[in-house]
Design a protein with these regions (language model features):
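Active-site-adjacent structural elements that line small-molecule/cofactor binding pockets in enzymes
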Residues: 1-144
Length: 144
């Protein structure tokens, strides 16, 4: 799997990759990259499984005012120069599922959800929330 959305990364993905990992791309931006990679793979006479496109983002059941989220958002914006909401979803399970559905609608089918918390107990609680309120409801997602 190859990551990145530069033209060079897209060409590498189409020529050598077996999948692609979005970095901080919005669902719509990821969709454009997916299409370009599929075309690059076709130009290189390579098969590319349409279910080998992924995205990862931080998730927090809570509020943007929660300390772990404020720190993560600040770090994200400082590191990337982009708005934190591109790489973090905060709220409830339905909001996380909405973001996932947006990616699915744009050709992305695999996800890395990174719980946001401080300390083992909070990380465990956030992970439990992901399992209960996202994974257990993933059958609600519609294929594009």
């Amino acid at each position: 799997w190859i990551g990145g959305s530069s033209e060079a990364a897209i060409e590498r993905s189409g020529k050598y990759g077996t999948g692609w990992q979005a970095a901080f791309d919005t669902p719509e931006e990821a969709g454009v990259v997916v299409e370009k990679i599929l075309h690059a793979a076709e130009r290189n006479s390579r098969p590319m499984d349409k279910d080998h496109f992924s995205a990862g983002f931080g998730v927090r059941f809570g509020s943007w005012e929660d300390e772990p989220v404020k720190k993560m958002a600040e770090d994200f914006e400082k590191r990337t120069g982009k708005e934190a909401s591109r790489g973090i979803v905060v709220g409830n399970g339905d909001q996380i599922l909405e973001r996932i559905q947006s990616y699915v609608d744009n050709g992305v089918s695999k996800f890395i959800l990174r719980p946001i918390g401080i300390g083992d107990e909070e990380m465990f609680e956030q992970t439990e929330q992901i399992i209960e309120n996202v994974l257990n409801k993933s059958d609600q997602l519609l294929e594009a």
